Amino acid sequence: MEAHQFIKAPGITTAIEQAALAAANSALANAVVVRPFLSHQQIEILINLMQPRQLVFRPEVFWNHPIQRVIHNELELYCRARSGRCLEIGAHPRSINDNPNVVHRCFLRPAGRDVQRWYTAPTRGPAANCRRSALRGLPAADRTYCFDGFSGCNFPAETGVALYSLHDMSPSDVAEAMFRHGMTRLYAALHLPPEVLLPPGTYRTASYLLIHDGRRVVVTYEGDTSAGYNHDVSNLRSWIRTTKVTGDHPLVIERVRAIGCHFVLLLTAAPEPSPTPYVPYPRSTEVYVRSIFGPGGTPSLFPTSCSTKSTFHAVPAHIWDRLMLFGATLDDQAFCCSRLMTYLRGISYKVTVGTLVANEGWNASEVALTAVITAAYLTICHQRYLRTQAISKGMRRLEREHAQKFITRLYSWLFEKSGRDYIPGRQLEFYAQCRRWLSAGFHLDPRVLVFDESAPCHCRTAIRKAVSKFCCFMKWLGQECTCFLQPAEGAVGDQGHDNEAYEGSDVDPAESAISDISGSYVVPGTALQPLYQALDLPAEIVARAGRLTATVKVSQVDGRIDCETLLGNKTFRTSFVDGAVLETNGPERHNLSFDASQSTMAAGPFSLTYAASAAGLEVRYVAAGLDHRAVFAPGVSPRSAPGEVTAFCSALYRFNREAQRLSLTGNFWFHPEGLLGPFAPFSPGHVWESANPFCGESTLYTRTWSEVDAVSSPAQPDLGFISEPSIPSRAATLTPAAPLPPPAPDPSPTPSAPARGEPAPGATARAPAITHQAARHRRLLFTYPDGSKVFAGSLFESTCTWLVNASNVDHRPGGGLCHAFYQRYPASFDAASFVMRDGAAAYTLTPRPIIHAVAPDYRLEHNPKMLEAAYRETCSRLGTAAYPLLGTGIYQVPIGPSFDAWERNHRPGDELYLPELAARWFEANRPTCPTLTITEDVARTANLAIELDSATDVGRACAGCRVTPGVVQYQFTAGVPGSGKSRSITQADVDVVVVPTRELRNAWRRRGFAAFTPHTAARVTQGRRVVIDEAPSLPPHLLLLHMQRAATVHLLGDPNQIPAIDFEHAGLVPAIRPDLAPTSWWHVTHRCPADVCELIRGAYPMIQTTSRVLRSLFWGEPAVGQKLVFTQAAKAANPGSVTVHEAQGATYTETTIIATADARGLIQSSRAHAIVALTRHTEKCVIIDAPGLLREVGISDAIVNNFFLAGGEIGHQRPSVIPRGNPDANVDTLAAFPPSCQISAFHQLAEELGHRPAPVAAVLPPCPELEQGLLYLPQELTTCDSVVTFELTDIVHCRMAAPSQRKAVLSTLVGHYGRRTKLYNASHSDVRDSLARFIPAIGHVQVTTCELYELVEAMVEKGQDGSAVLELDLCNRDVSRITFFQKDCNKFTTGETIAHGKVGQGISAWSKTFCALFGPWFRAIEKAILALLPQGVFYGDAFDDTVFSAAVAAARASMVFENDFSEFDSTQNNFSLGLECAIMVECGMPQWLIRLYHLIRSAWILQAPKESLRGFWKKHSGEPGTLLWNTVWNMAVITHCYDFRDLQVAAFKGDDSIVLCSEYRQSPGAAVLIAGCGLKLKVDFRPIGLYAGVVVAPGLGALPDVVRFAGRLTEKNWGPGPERAKQLRLAVSDFLRKLTNVAQMCVDVVSRVYGVSPGLVHNLIGMLQAVADGKAHFTESVKPVLDLTNSILCRVE
């Protein structure tokens, strides 16, 4: 037996699963988001109605009509996306402000429910005017809306949208109204339930309840809380039945979208409507069963015989179908009514097995059940009778046929053969049955209803109406009637413009003559200031325009206005005609609506009217929120300053380009004459007249949004192909306002002789210009260097000269794409019109250039050669061609081979269009090489630089070279200096090497390569394999030229080294410098010694070296080796030297860097010069830096000398950076916390903590008494009385202090460092032994260059250089200065925020020299301590948060021991300092360095900006080892003073510490240490504790402290600029990221530790979500400063 079907195929299974997953992901990505809260039944209804669309439920709002509104929103999106700029009928008031594409809205005066809708309409924006006119009965304020209704308005528009607003109009009325508007298309959303076709009654379906009384129908959907739809029955019936309107205003009605019984109808004006039958309800889930007995009626003398009064019942289609199948197949003896009733009762119960619904069921009333049983029984009885009769009559017929003789059979056989339409079988006889008989059935199935009725428009003549009624009467009788009246062809709108929102002019020829406004007018910018504000222009442009005045010469001729604007030394021309295209800075298009008879202009949201008056030209500007009049006096204005005009034009250009980059849709492209002209802001037909070739339109006003995607093919070498002449523009444009000069002919070469196998030039198909303009939906996937492009989309959107059809061998209409070609261009398949054949391909020019290409049929045979030939045969043409993937449809050619064949056989500029499946394949297999796009602006600027360069002696080789717009593929190998990039190139890989200098050229030639400098290489790079060494330093115009001319290009270089220098200072080099992305990075250098690597590691973080030289940099020694200088003057002064720029790429054994004073600006502006100079040697480099230029950029001997002086060694250590990762959203409980109101959150926080709004901004506490030291005061203690803050709330939850106040600085100095120090002279051995529990004996510590690098890296990250690091000279005050400044950070507190009496916080920063001296040692000691820490002990923040949280979670049975040090810094004394020095001795630090540290700490001077304090012993918060020694002292105190049982976790950071244990007690020696040092310890022992911004909950983990973080936000000043707010918002986002998986746990735990309600924490998280989303509200407050300072008592020690 065969068993292959039982063999499991893992590959196929995996592919199927991946395809299913991809389909599911695609469905979810394009799902409909359902925002309202819904019941379970409503969700099931929506899922059934919206099939097959995927739904995503995100409940966040309550709607009165949730089901209808979801459907409405979906259909609205479809209508608005298709209609573009349009006229809207009956818009909902709340949608006005959200849809700026609507040019006009037609309303009716409000009545009934409409009044309530207008009261809830927005009171701002365009809706405000509409609301005011609707509620007050006022006329419309502008042309954007009216209250005349759709049928009473005549605003011209080509496209319309009606969303559920045409139920009270018939199709004929709509056709007439569309004709009045000149409308050709109307998208109408209508609710058309099938029950309106039935008699009056009450119909309940699974979705809605419908009540039908004969005239009106009321529909209420499941879950509606207010009245539903209420419409006229006759209109709904006509909308369901009608597919076309005939008469003087013909229409075609097409159903383009349907969701349930909600339809989108596309009404299109068509001269000859054709029959378009349609099935409106193919997915109906109900069948309507008729009851024999109708409802009770009114009393009457005689019983009624009207059959239309009977009642119908909605029955699920599956119930009726199953019931009929069961009854029709029952045995004759088993068929009875009771059996039908039993079966119906069984299938009416809903049965669910697990998650599978086995039987959907039906919840029906008794009346409906009775009607269904009756109808089903009678229908089945009738069918059974027919079955019996048919079998009986058929048997008798068979008996007669079998008894026929030979002659009769022969006679029948001959006549059957002669018949053309042969259908087997025979009808025996006609069964008498009519539609209204009982035998016709009792049910109506909407799934099989077909309608194709026409409605005549009401404007037909009486004769036409009479004949129409006669025809309809004859049809009602069942007779065919040929109407002799043809539909009258009426106007269907302006056909001259293919613009969806074109507003034609309704001009009455009988109106008065047009007023003439010709003349010269003075237009000052000050008169148009309100308009500038409405245009939302920047303040700079408004200010510059206000200082300018223009002279405008207006000429009006034949409904057209020409303006000549004189602005300074510039002249602009504009031409105003109706329908002119206005330039925009985005994809959206605007056309000018100009009515000369009405003296009006309009486009987009702006309109104006003008009139000649005695004072001059009076213009009224109208827009949203703007109604401004301006009068321009006749005459000539004084000439504005050329400098002001140029600055205005440049600023305006920058604004246009910035708006172009940021806008998705775009707005007007503002020209100077458009803002300083009488008809602002319009400037159609803009021309800037300028005789200077370096200014004007070509350089300043260059837009990237063009009318067409013109493909320009780059110049190709003459290879025997047919030359391509210049092709006229293929974009259909409106008639220009002014005659345009003829285009210059393209200097293309003469056609050469055709290649073998190609047709002669005379036989080549020559393409005429093609006009094409349509909406683009294609998507660019890739662009090749030759200009060819790959698109995803429809082939017919292309603007190429030729279209390629996937044809068959006979070139007859077929299926697939060939059928689409036949539908659009049927004449192209006429073989008589073929102008040329090439192999199997046929060329035709009728009705447009088309190539019928024939691919092989892979169903029969795989033939790659024929596939190549199919593409090759389409290249015998002039112009570009748009291709499909030949053969991938019906012929089943794989996508890959067909695509490869096109790549090898196409011409430059061709286009390939892929369907979605092939597009996905291409995106998964697209070329991986990076590409450089050369835009028109870059090409133009590069060519200008080449022209300037070719005029010099060096650049003569570049004469005639051009850079063309396009895309270039390249390979870029980047690497650190000396990484061997050049050595990796072999002669077999390259034809030409381009290098920037002669030295490099000679070096390459010595290796056997053909190397050239950039200018001379222009003769040899065409079509060659090119390697460009030191590519970033090449002049960018030459780099672009060689990259574009080369067949393949491989770039070598270092992006961090010297870029190309603009020696001419023309500004062209930085304008076209390309942004090159390295394809590979090499990080290992074979040249640079170790110390050089450490100095440049800031630019190369991953640099490594193979050099064994450890120290190579020396200062102050005699010059050796090659001299390197920075300027040409220094080169002249030092014979034999080369500049750093010339030495780039070279390698020397020894070098001497000579920095002269004239190189200061160069080195400060380009640190790359210093990097190049430092990386040229392999053994030794002597630096002669008399002016100290290299020191200013962080390269000095002070850092290195101090490092080695302190005992540093060259070597490698473990880096101090701790790897951290972002937690995955594996639970993502944060998603359950939506953004909430910040006001309510902060008010609730204030209530829970007992804080109230503070009447002051800060508090200056009383200054403590100075107990030790000497304080120097300024003569004046000036203070500001108030503070301006930009805050989230006026309730602050932090201790309030004033860091910028001078008195606050004094209070902090004295309070922290002026307190008397309690000295304690004792041995450190006991404390060190106790500390060994956490930090064992450290031993000798090695300080390496790794710590030196980390020090330099930290300085660079802070924006510092090495200039502040000095030689270690203690006589120099700058070496030992300690700077004090007030800290702008206040502590969060749950207690008193004002009357706390505590001084502020400050930082005492040591000098950069001391930081560089001690910093590497302290980093090395810290690394040693981290390596010795026991398990469960955490130091500082040198650990991953997840590891700490896991350790806390593991300590389930522990309590939290917390210690709060008070006055931690000020209580440190000689004993703590001695312990630090003892540990330094233990680590092997030099004794002189330890004694220096002890000296600095024991007696010091803190230097504030205007104050200073001389003091003793205190700990400094800004010294290099602050965190290290504070943490060590904290550990020593805790472990010496307390004993812990079952210690699980201990964490120390500065003065903050926690220990997780089961019990603790104070150790015997604790009292001596606490009393001797004057320590102030506050211990707390509780189940949950706080530590370093997190909540420590044993068994649960370390959770973010939401309350503390939110409280600290209240103290932050979010101003004055947006940068500060952005920083804080990023901090909030980072904090929320920590809450991703533990948000709900935080609510429970944080609320317990602070004793607040969980709702508060929940509300605070929502508030933080709102802040992170940028939805925070800020309040600017000006509050006074409370001064509580008293006199400062000084006492000299």
From Swiss-Prot:
<comment type="subunit">
    <text>The protease domain interacts with host EIF2AK4 (via C-terminus); this interaction inhibits dimerization of EIF2AK4 and prevents EIF2AK4-mediated phosphorylation of host EIF2A.</text>
</comment>
<dbReference type="Pfam" id="PF01660">
    <property type="entry name" value="Vmethyltransf"/>
</dbReference>
<dbReference type="GO" id="GO:0005524">
    <property type="term" value="F:ATP binding"/>
</dbReference>
<feature type="region of interest" description="RNA-directed RNA polymerase">
    <location>
        <begin position="1207"/>
        <end position="1693"/>
    </location>
</feature>
<keyword id="KW-0460">Magnesium</keyword>
<dbReference type="GO" id="GO:0039722">
    <property type="term" value="P:symbiont-mediated suppression of host toll-like receptor signaling pathway"/>
</dbReference>
<keyword id="KW-0693">Viral RNA replication</keyword>
<dbReference type="Pfam" id="PF01661">
    <property type="entry name" value="Macro"/>
</dbReference>
<keyword id="KW-0862">Zinc</keyword>
<dbReference type="InterPro" id="IPR043502">
    <property type="entry name" value="DNA/RNA_pol_sf"/>
</dbReference>
<dbReference type="GO" id="GO:0039540">
    <property type="term" value="P:symbiont-mediated suppression of host cytoplasmic pattern recognition receptor signaling pathway via inhibition of RIG-I activity"/>
</dbReference>
<keyword id="KW-1223">Inhibition of host TBK1 by virus</keyword>
<dbReference type="GO" id="GO:0003968">
    <property type="term" value="F:RNA-directed RNA polymerase activity"/>
</dbReference>
<dbReference type="GO" id="GO:0039554">
    <property type="term" value="P:symbiont-mediated suppression of host cytoplasmic pattern recognition receptor signaling pathway via inhibition of MDA-5 activity"/>
</dbReference>
<feature type="region of interest" description="Hinge">
    <location>
        <begin position="712"/>
        <end position="770"/>
    </location>
</feature>
<dbReference type="GO" id="GO:0008174">
    <property type="term" value="F:mRNA methyltransferase activity"/>
</dbReference>
<keyword id="KW-1035">Host cytoplasm</keyword>
<dbReference type="GO" id="GO:0044220">
    <property type="term" value="C:host cell perinuclear region of cytoplasm"/>
</dbReference>
<keyword id="KW-0489">Methyltransferase</keyword>
<feature type="domain" description="(+)RNA virus helicase ATP-binding">
    <location>
        <begin position="934"/>
        <end position="1082"/>
    </location>
</feature>
<dbReference type="InterPro" id="IPR047307">
    <property type="entry name" value="Hepeviridae_RdRp"/>
</dbReference>
<feature type="binding site">
    <location>
        <begin position="975"/>
        <end position="982"/>
    </location>
    <ligand>
        <name>ATP</name>
    </ligand>
</feature>
<keyword id="KW-0347">Helicase</keyword>
<dbReference type="InterPro" id="IPR043472">
    <property type="entry name" value="Macro_dom-like"/>
</dbReference>
<dbReference type="Pfam" id="PF01443">
    <property type="entry name" value="Viral_helicase1"/>
</dbReference>
<dbReference type="InterPro" id="IPR007094">
    <property type="entry name" value="RNA-dir_pol_PSvirus"/>
</dbReference>
<keyword id="KW-0378">Hydrolase</keyword>
<feature type="region of interest" description="Disordered">
    <location>
        <begin position="732"/>
        <end position="768"/>
    </location>
</feature>
<keyword id="KW-1089">Inhibition of host MDA5 by virus</keyword>
<dbReference type="InterPro" id="IPR001788">
    <property type="entry name" value="RNA-dep_RNA_pol_alsuvir"/>
</dbReference>
<dbReference type="InterPro" id="IPR002588">
    <property type="entry name" value="Alphavirus-like_MT_dom"/>
</dbReference>
<dbReference type="Pfam" id="PF12526">
    <property type="entry name" value="DUF3729"/>
</dbReference>
<keyword id="KW-0945">Host-virus interaction</keyword>
<keyword id="KW-0808">Transferase</keyword>
<dbReference type="GO" id="GO:0019082">
    <property type="term" value="P:viral protein processing"/>
</dbReference>
<dbReference type="GO" id="GO:0008168">
    <property type="term" value="F:methyltransferase activity"/>
</dbReference>
<feature type="domain" description="Macro">
    <location>
        <begin position="775"/>
        <end position="921"/>
    </location>
</feature>
<keyword id="KW-0548">Nucleotidyltransferase</keyword>
<dbReference type="InterPro" id="IPR027417">
    <property type="entry name" value="P-loop_NTPase"/>
</dbReference>
<keyword id="KW-1092">Inhibition of host IRF3 by virus</keyword>
<feature type="binding site">
    <location>
        <position position="671"/>
    </location>
    <ligand>
        <name>Zn(2+)</name>
    </ligand>
</feature>
<dbReference type="GO" id="GO:0006351">
    <property type="term" value="P:DNA-templated transcription"/>
</dbReference>
